[in-house]
């Protein structure tokens, strides 16, 4: 039966019926439109911590969720609000969907509501904060919910007794207050205790304001909730002073709730037992009846269940089956001719599904419509589903309005349907479970996983659901390979482990493997044949490139570098035209666009090729490319290309699905040359779909353009990276690298970015020394300046400010003022917004105080750059703009059919579209004649590229004074301010920092909170962590403990310089010793760069490994140069071989290991265990 998920706005005192204690600081609620539209913000700011009682004067409707005692409007605690997507639906369909939602809401009296927050200070993700038992549903006609419902909205008020109906509430606000008062970092606590209840695998249900979930899903969520509550109890045991923050009337926010914290675990167990023990046999019956046209289906079902229980349910089911089989009405049960006629109108397979399957499944009529839609579109085969219902898990397609059916749901439904005949060892069930695991890994970016990954995931699943052991799971997979292989491809891979050879198995979804095969076949086909015969004169090409570089050497670039850059560009043009497939890679400013323009001109002028396509992953990048190409070709997004060229095979309105299986050879596109720009952003499915549409016989050139060091795509896989690695092995001349930056302002920026690449130690130290050359102190803060002489003028190109006084906002304002002053202006909006010359970048959207969400609200509401007369307007309007000030915004969804106004051609363009990543600024429409009154006061966005305007849909836009680094990929900005808050070490990767730094074209200002190491030290690699097997590029090093290989990756995913260091890292991991490789902060403190820093029982131990003592120069450097520096800094030096139980460790310890030690890894393990004991 149905339960509720409901979104509530973050409240800094636990929704205790009071105004937030710090309303100005707590801005997480402001993304909820009513905070602005009701204009209650000022009330909150002026009345912090005021008791709301029954007052309606509050910004967020949910401030009273856990308020003590009764509240207004019949004890309503929070609203349940559902929005119906109107896209591609007529008014009748919308009315029916709304009616079904209203009917389903009747079913949740006495059921349970899971409460969650969206924007919050705890996590980048949505977080569950509690669960309550629903006592009553208040009708939407009540004034509290609004008498006048919007045409696509259904609203109800939820009532529960705060004394008796709270199943659990997680004390997150109390935890933050505890950390603040104890001067503790919450990130440190979270390293030890798993306290944050992120929605994780359940994310599909946590969309919009409210959603319904089945008992089965509710049970899974509650089981995770039980783990979190028990973890909080462990935390309480070790931090007993935390309890007063829960129950002490003087400091606790909601002691009337939290005094029962000890009972929460038992509450959850009781609810789980209740939901698992539900006796409903046909919970899908009301959905089937509503689908067939019985508008009061849910009400009838509830009434029969209340009055007669299982017997009433059985009566309704039998009456339905009898009426359908005999084609005869039964008005006693509401089964009219209309119901029977609609059933007859269905295809036979769907009738069978409705009668004998759907009645057991907890599916709404809306979901049945979606299943029918996918059946009619031939996404799924109902004949096969009737034979094997688990296909619903494997084949149903998901979109924004339809969550796929997960294994746990369908499996519980099948147990209900089959009863004693249920077989947990069915190969079809096992296959569906395997597919489910692979789909969840796919959502994390992994296209391929090993048996180890499979086991790790399997063992986290609920054993009561899985019903079989992992060994049984593998045995069934092996025994029924023919059945498994219909949906999953299993590859055996040979791995060399020292002198031994091991066989590992890799698992990939069949659909993903098909995309990989398309890519592999394309690459290998083009490699086997020669490119068109073209007479290339390198000297002429070089001159052509010189002219394109404006026939002059850029200021700040010396002659030797300039000529070398031209050599590289010339070589790139020649090699890319000599190979049918190639890669052009390099950071911004190295001339990639110049090379591509030259290649396209030669393709046209010399080879006569006209069908040249440039495709990009985002609309923004397509617009930027078009601006640079001067009509040589029209760039468009991959999505638009597919939608336009293959509209007969493309489902683009509700699903992004291209029916490649139906595109025959003749239907494929004849293209002379395909250039894919920003290739690092293209995921495996998009790349596979694209290449699957092209007739390879006609394709003369395929060129991938991008920066190989950037972040992997948001979607699954890393095809650009895998193709690069493959070509590097089989055809290295087809890879063209541009390394010399020809923008003088960018040169130092690119050099700094190399800190996050795999460069040697000497180059790293050279860059660091350049950085430390101009170090200053400003109060408590440290400032590092990197300058460049450009045209005889010394310019500050990079500023790195380490903020130790805690005032990031002040430092941000100072950074903005510095950049404005350098550009001879004081007008922030003219410079940063209207002309897009300044961009703030941050790693996260909502995590912590300085995600893009909070920075954006600070800029528009509090910063010194808002003129006083505009402050109220900026505060009261979520998006605002006029000629003086405006909100900078970014489009976050593709809208292919959006009409826009072309400001250059001064005309409306039908279905031009606006695309994810496009940026611009808002302004409020003012009517200038009576015909435009309906648009008055609507917000319009003026986009930068192309120069178009469009009316906004607020759900498709976000503020963009600050954006996340991920959103910045594919864009460049003249001036960049990068903010790196503390506590994000596990989140920020090398690729993320590299991408952020290289977004800056002329000026970079980095603001680092607390310590420089928060910026410089990261061993995390998103590319290394992502598991793929495209072109057999699966990285096996994390599976096998010790593999001798240059630049090897450890079990933890970081690259080390030698196999011996990898051995040590993996041994540390094996015994549970935390370590960091090549910790730059130690270099900053002592002047040498140790191989490892260990953390054992809060004792810091440095580690140097001597791997080449047979080399005299190496030995001398270690003994005569490095060791004295350690001694000067007070380090006691101990050899690993000398450690025993009697060894005494001082405060500063350096351990030295040698190659000799690693000849016996078992002995090293024992030494490490001894080290743990004596520390």
From Swiss-Prot:
The keyword ATP-binding applies. Keywords: ATP-binding, Nucleotide-binding. ATP binds at residues 586-593. The keyword Cell wall biogenesis/degradation does not apply. GO terms for molecular function: ATP binding; DNA helicase activity. InterPro entries: Coronavir_polyprotein_1ab, P-loop_NTPase, RecD2-like_HHH, UvrD-like_helicase_C. PANTHER family: DNA HELICASE B, DNA2/NAM7 HELICASE FAMILY MEMBER. This is Uncharacterized protein MJ1519.
């Amino acid at each position: 039966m149905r339960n509720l998920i409901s979104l509530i706005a973050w409240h800094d005192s636990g929704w205790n019926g009071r105004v937030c204690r710090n309303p100005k600081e707590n801005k997480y609620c402001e993304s909820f439109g009513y905070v602005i539209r009701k204009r209650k913000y000022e009330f909150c700011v002026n009345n912090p911590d005021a008791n709301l009682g029954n007052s309606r004067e509050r910004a967020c409707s949910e401030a009273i969720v856990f308020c003590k005692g009764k509240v207004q409007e019949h004890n309503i605690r929070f609203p349940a609000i559902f929005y119906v997507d109107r896209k591609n639906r007529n008014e009748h369909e919308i009315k029916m969907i709304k009616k079904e939602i209203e009917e389903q809401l009747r079913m949740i009296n006495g059921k349970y509501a899971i409460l969650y927050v969206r924007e919050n200070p705890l996590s980048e993700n949505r977080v569950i904060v509690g669960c309550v038992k629903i006592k009553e549903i208040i009708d939407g006609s009540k004034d509290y919910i609004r008498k006048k419902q919007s045409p696509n909205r259904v609203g109800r008020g939820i009532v529960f007794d705060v004394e008796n109906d709270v199943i659990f509430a997680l004390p997150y606000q109390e935890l933050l207050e505890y950390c603040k008062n104890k001067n503790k970092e919450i990130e440190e606590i979270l390293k030890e205790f798993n306290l944050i209840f992120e929605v994780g695998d359940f994310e599909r249900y946590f969309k919009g304001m409210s959603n319904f979930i089945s008992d089965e899903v509710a049970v899974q969520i509650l089981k995770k909730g039980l783990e979190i509550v028990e973890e909080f109890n462990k935390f309480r045991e070790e931090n007993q002073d935390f309890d007063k923050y829960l129950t002490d009337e003087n400091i606790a926010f909601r002691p009337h709730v939290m005094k029962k914290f000890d009972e929460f675990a038992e509450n959850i167990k009781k609810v789980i037992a209740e939901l698992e023990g539900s006796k409903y046999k046909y919970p899908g019956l009301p959905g089937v009846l509503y689908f067939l046209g019985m508008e009061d289906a849910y009400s009838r079902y509830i009434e029969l269940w209340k009055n007669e229980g299982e017997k009433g349910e059985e009566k309704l089911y039998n009456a339905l089956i009898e009426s359908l089989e005999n084609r005869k009405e039964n008005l006693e049960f509401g089964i009219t001719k209309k119901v029977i006629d609609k059933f007859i109108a269905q295809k036979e397979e769907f009738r069978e599904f409705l009668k004998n399957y759907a009645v057991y499944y907890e599916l709404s009529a809306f979901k049945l419509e979606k299943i029918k839609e996918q059946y009619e579109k031939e996404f799924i085969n109902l004949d096969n589903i009737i034979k094997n219902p688990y296909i619903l898990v494997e084949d149903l397609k998901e979109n924004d309005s339809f969550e796929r059916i997960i294994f746990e749901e369908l499996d519980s439904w099948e147990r209900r349907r089959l009863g004693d005949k249920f077989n947990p060892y069915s190969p079809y069930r096992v296959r569906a479970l395997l597919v489910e695991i692979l789909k969840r890994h796919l959502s994390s970016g992994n296209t391929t996983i090993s048996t180890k990954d499979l086991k790790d995931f399997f063992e986290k699943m609920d054993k009561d659901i899985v019903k079989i052991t992992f060994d049984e799971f593998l045995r069934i997979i092996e025994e029924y390979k023919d059945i498994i292989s219909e949906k999953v491809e299993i590859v055996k891979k040979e791995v060399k482990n020292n002198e031994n050879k091991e066989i590992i198995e890799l698992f990939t979804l069949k659909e993903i493997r098909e995309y990989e095969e398309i890519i592999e076949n394309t690459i290998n086909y083009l490699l086997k044949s020669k490119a068109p015969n073209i007479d290339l004169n390198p000297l002429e090409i070089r001159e052509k490139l010189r002219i394109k570089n404006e026939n002059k050497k850029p200021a700040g670039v010396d002659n030797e570098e300039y000529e070398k850059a031209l050599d590289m560009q010339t070589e790139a043009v020649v090699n890319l035209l000599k190979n049918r497939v190639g890669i052009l890679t390099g950071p911004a400013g190295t001339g990639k666009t110049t090379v591509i323009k030259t290649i396209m001109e030669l393709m046209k002028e010399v080879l006569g090729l006209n069908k040249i396509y440039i495709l990009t992953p985002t609309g923004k990048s397509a617009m930027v490319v078009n601006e640079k190409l001067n009509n040589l070709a029209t760039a468009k997004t991959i999505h638009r290309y597919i939608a336009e060229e293959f509209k007969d095979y493309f489902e683009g309105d509700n699903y992004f699905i291209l029916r490649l299986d139906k595109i025959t050879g003749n239907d494929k596109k004849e293209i002379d040359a395909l250039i894919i720009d920003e290739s690092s952003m293209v995921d495996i499915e998009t790349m596979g779909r694209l290449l699957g549409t092209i007739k390879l016989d006609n394709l003369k050139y395929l060129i991938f353009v991008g920066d190989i060091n950037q972040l992997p795509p948001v979607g699954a896989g890393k095809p650009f990276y895998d193709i690069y690695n493959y070509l590097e092995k089989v055809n290295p001349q087809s890879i063209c690298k541009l390394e010399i930056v020809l923008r003088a302002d960018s040169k130092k920026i690119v050099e700094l970015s190399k800190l996050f690449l795999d460069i040697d130690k000497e180059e790293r130290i050279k860059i660091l020394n350049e950085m430390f050359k101009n170090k200053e102190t400003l109060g408590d803060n440290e400032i590092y300046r990197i300058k460049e002489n450009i045209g005889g003028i010394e310019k500050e190109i990079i500023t790195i400010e380490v903020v130790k006084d805690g005032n990031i906002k002040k430092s941000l304002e100072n950074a903005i003022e510095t950049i404005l002053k350098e550009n001879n202006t004081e007008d922030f909006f003219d410079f940063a917004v209207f002309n897009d010359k300044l961009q703030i970048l941050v790693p996260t959207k909502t995590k912590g105080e300085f995600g893009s969400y909070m920075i954006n609200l600070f800029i528009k509401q509090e910063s010194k750059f808002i003129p006083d007369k505009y402050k109220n307007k900026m505060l009261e309007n979520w998006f605002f703009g006029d000629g003086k000030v405006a909100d900078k915004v970014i489009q976050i969804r593709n809208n292919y059919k959006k009409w826009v106004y072309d400001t250059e051609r001064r005309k409306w363009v039908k279905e031009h579209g606006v695309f994810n990543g496009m940026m611009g600024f808002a302004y409020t429409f003012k009517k200038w004649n009576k015909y435009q009154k309906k648009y008055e006061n609507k917000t319009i966005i003026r986009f930068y590229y192309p120069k178009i305007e469009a009316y906004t849909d607020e759900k498709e836009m976000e503020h963009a004074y600050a954006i996340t680094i991920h959103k910045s990929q594919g864009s460049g900005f003249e001036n960049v301010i990068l903010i790196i808050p503390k506590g994000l070490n596990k989140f920020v990767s090398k690729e993320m920092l590299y991408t952020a730094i290289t977004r800056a074209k002329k000026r970079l200002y980095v603001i680092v909170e607390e310590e420089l190491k928060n910026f410089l030290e990261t061993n995390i690699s998103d590319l290394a962590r992502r598991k793929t097997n495209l072109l057999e590029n699966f990285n096996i090093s994390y599976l096998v403990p010790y593999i001798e290989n240059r630049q090897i990756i450890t079990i933890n995913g970081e690259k080390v310089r030698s196999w011996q260091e990898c051995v040590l890292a993996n041994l540390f991991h094996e015994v549970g010793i935390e370590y960091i490789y090549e910790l730059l902060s130690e270099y900053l403190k002592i002047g040498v760069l140790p191989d490892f820093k260990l953390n054992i029982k809060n004792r810091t131990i440095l580690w140097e490994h001597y791997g080449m003592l047979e080399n005299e120069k190496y030995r001398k450097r270690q003994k005569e140069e490095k060791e004295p520096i350690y001694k000067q800094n007070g380090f006691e030096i101990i050899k690993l071989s000398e450690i025993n139980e009697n060894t005494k460790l001082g405060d500063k310890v350096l351990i030295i290991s040698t190659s000799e030690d690693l000849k016996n890894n078992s002995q090293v393990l024992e030494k490490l265990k001894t080290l743990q004991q004596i520390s």
